[in-house]
Amino acid sequence: MKTLYSPRRYYPVETLFNGTLSVGGRDQETTGFAWWAGNARLINLSGKLLGAHVAHAGLIVFWAGAMNLFEVAHFVPEKPMYEQGLILLPHLASLGWGVGPGGEVIDTFPYFVSGVLHVISSAVLGFGGVYHAIIGPETLEESFPFFGYVWKDKNKMTTILGIHLVLLGFGALLLVAKAVWFGGVYDTWAPGGGDVRVITNPTYDPSIIFGYLLKSPFGGEGWITSVDNMEDIIGGHIWIGFICIFGGIWHIVTKPFAWARRAFVWSGEAYLSYSLGAISAMGFIACCFVWFNNTAYPSEFYGPTGPEASQAQAFTFLVRDQRLGANIGSAQGPTGLGKYLMRSPTGEIIFGGETMRFWDLRAPWLEPLRGPNGLDLSKLKKDIQPWQERRSAEYMTHAPLGSLNSVGGVATEINAVNYVSPRSWLSTSHFVLGFFFFVAHLWHAGRARAAAAGFEKGIERETEPVLFMSPLD
């Protein structure tokens, strides 16, 4: 009978190595998987699978620490982070470490400490991974039943899910603790151009927090990506932290309901597919967040958003031409619309020119110049501060765009300056990885469903035409 994990279910392709290559004492004949299938050989060996996962965690943490130290070693304090291709230091700076007013780096030692701690942690994880992969028991069920499991044990699986949720909840609350009790976080909206600030009054109101989830993802609504203040971000982490903790406790103390037992496929590959689907969704959300949001991802560290760079260019030339004597309130552009200022369809005063498409941008360097009806003409004439001019000029020349023509009026010839914005890197990489993880989700979900239904889709090797053809030589 072809049971769920029987090697006979897989009809392996015959290769040169099938009978000869054995990795770690496990070959294709005994496991049903070739050497390159990696952890699939360990599906029913909980001890060895633990070793693989711990070692993998060690590799991840080692990358984080080593890359962190690499960025610290190459960091130039006089240049903005986004001009130096940094992707880790901006995250640490956003947490309020090592920075002061305006996002200026005043101390790199916390970044060094972070890198060293990660490298040391990776050594501990690496040792644990090697131990469990080579020395530790192959299965945990006999020696350590609390850590052992069988994939089909629905109650054990939801208990493991619950433990993960509790840990995630505490992780969310760590950010809350940093923001509220341990020195605060960097707030790009702090008066005068951003500063590290203790969040003393996080948002608890569920109508505000869950209102983001009920927003449209399109246009100016922006779903959760539209969050524009640190109080809501920290309040959201308070809510999600406790939801994860209480949800985790629920999954630990309860057994799956009948409808859940019927609805889900309960196998290792099914859990893999669920996880890949969840990570894919997180990747797509992260892509949008880092591309559009300048509160969670402050422009001082990650560079301006696309709309922000475009609006910054319009603002920079408005400042220049106003100094040269232009009347910014009445000057016409080549299309007959306002050259510097115009009205949006709903009546607000906005920047003119190509940047009109980004009229609903909100940025800390621009908001002080708004009035009750959009940009305030009198403020633009009298109240522009030097820091606003400097910042907009900097953002104008560091758009997160690579295009042969202009986008939103910003000159973006990619060969002109050796610069790629961290926003471009982070959003593109998360979109691409999110897509690949989604494909992997579909792949493993299809295999898991097929296995649960008692068949395996694939080529029937026994009647494959190539087997009846004469050898090439």
UniProtKB/Swiss-Prot annotation:
<feature type="transmembrane region" description="Helical">
    <location>
        <begin position="255"/>
        <end position="275"/>
    </location>
</feature>
<feature type="transmembrane region" description="Helical">
    <location>
        <begin position="447"/>
        <end position="471"/>
    </location>
</feature>
<dbReference type="InterPro" id="IPR000932">
    <property type="entry name" value="PS_antenna-like"/>
</dbReference>
<protein>
    <recommendedName>
        <fullName>Photosystem II CP43 reaction center protein</fullName>
    </recommendedName>
</protein>
<keyword id="KW-0604">Photosystem II</keyword>
<feature type="transmembrane region" description="Helical">
    <location>
        <begin position="69"/>
        <end position="93"/>
    </location>
</feature>
<keyword id="KW-0007">Acetylation</keyword>
<keyword id="KW-0472">Membrane</keyword>
<dbReference type="InterPro" id="IPR005869">
    <property type="entry name" value="PSII_PsbC"/>
</dbReference>
<keyword id="KW-1133">Transmembrane helix</keyword>
<dbReference type="InterPro" id="IPR036001">
    <property type="entry name" value="PS_II_antenna-like_sf"/>
</dbReference>
<feature type="propeptide">
    <location>
        <begin position="1"/>
        <end position="14"/>
    </location>
</feature>
<keyword id="KW-0157">Chromophore</keyword>
<feature type="transmembrane region" description="Helical">
    <location>
        <begin position="291"/>
        <end position="312"/>
    </location>
</feature>
<dbReference type="GO" id="GO:0009523">
    <property type="term" value="C:photosystem II"/>
</dbReference>
<dbReference type="GO" id="GO:0045156">
    <property type="term" value="F:electron transporter, transferring electrons within the cyclic electron transport pathway of photosynthesis activity"/>
</dbReference>
<feature type="modified residue" description="N-acetylthreonine">
    <location>
        <position position="15"/>
    </location>
</feature>
<dbReference type="GO" id="GO:0009535">
    <property type="term" value="C:chloroplast thylakoid membrane"/>
</dbReference>
<dbReference type="Pfam" id="PF00421">
    <property type="entry name" value="PSII"/>
</dbReference>
<keyword id="KW-0812">Transmembrane</keyword>
<comment type="function">
    <text>One of the components of the core complex of photosystem II (PSII). It binds chlorophyll and helps catalyze the primary light-induced photochemical processes of PSII. PSII is a light-driven water:plastoquinone oxidoreductase, using light energy to abstract electrons from H(2)O, generating O(2) and a proton gradient subsequently used for ATP formation.</text>
</comment>
<dbReference type="InterPro" id="IPR044900">
    <property type="entry name" value="PSII_PsbC_sf"/>
</dbReference>
<comment type="subunit">
    <text>PSII is composed of 1 copy each of membrane proteins PsbA, PsbB, PsbC, PsbD, PsbE, PsbF, PsbH, PsbI, PsbJ, PsbK, PsbL, PsbM, PsbT, PsbX, PsbY, PsbZ, Psb30/Ycf12, at least 3 peripheral proteins of the oxygen-evolving complex and a large number of cofactors. It forms dimeric complexes.</text>
</comment>
<keyword id="KW-0934">Plastid</keyword>
<feature type="transmembrane region" description="Helical">
    <location>
        <begin position="134"/>
        <end position="155"/>
    </location>
</feature>
<keyword id="KW-0793">Thylakoid</keyword>
<dbReference type="GO" id="GO:0009772">
    <property type="term" value="P:photosynthetic electron transport in photosystem II"/>
</dbReference>
<feature type="modified residue" description="Phosphothreonine">
    <location>
        <position position="15"/>
    </location>
</feature>
<keyword id="KW-0150">Chloroplast</keyword>
<feature type="binding site">
    <location>
        <position position="367"/>
    </location>
    <ligand>
        <name>[CaMn4O5] cluster</name>
    </ligand>
</feature>
<keyword id="KW-0148">Chlorophyll</keyword>
<keyword id="KW-0602">Photosynthesis</keyword>
<keyword id="KW-0464">Manganese</keyword>
<dbReference type="GO" id="GO:0016168">
    <property type="term" value="F:chlorophyll binding"/>
</dbReference>
<keyword id="KW-0597">Phosphoprotein</keyword>
<keyword id="KW-0479">Metal-binding</keyword>
<dbReference type="GO" id="GO:0046872">
    <property type="term" value="F:metal ion binding"/>
</dbReference>
<comment type="similarity">
    <text>Belongs to the PsbB/PsbC family. PsbC subfamily.</text>
</comment>
<feature type="transmembrane region" description="Helical">
    <location>
        <begin position="178"/>
        <end position="200"/>
    </location>
</feature>
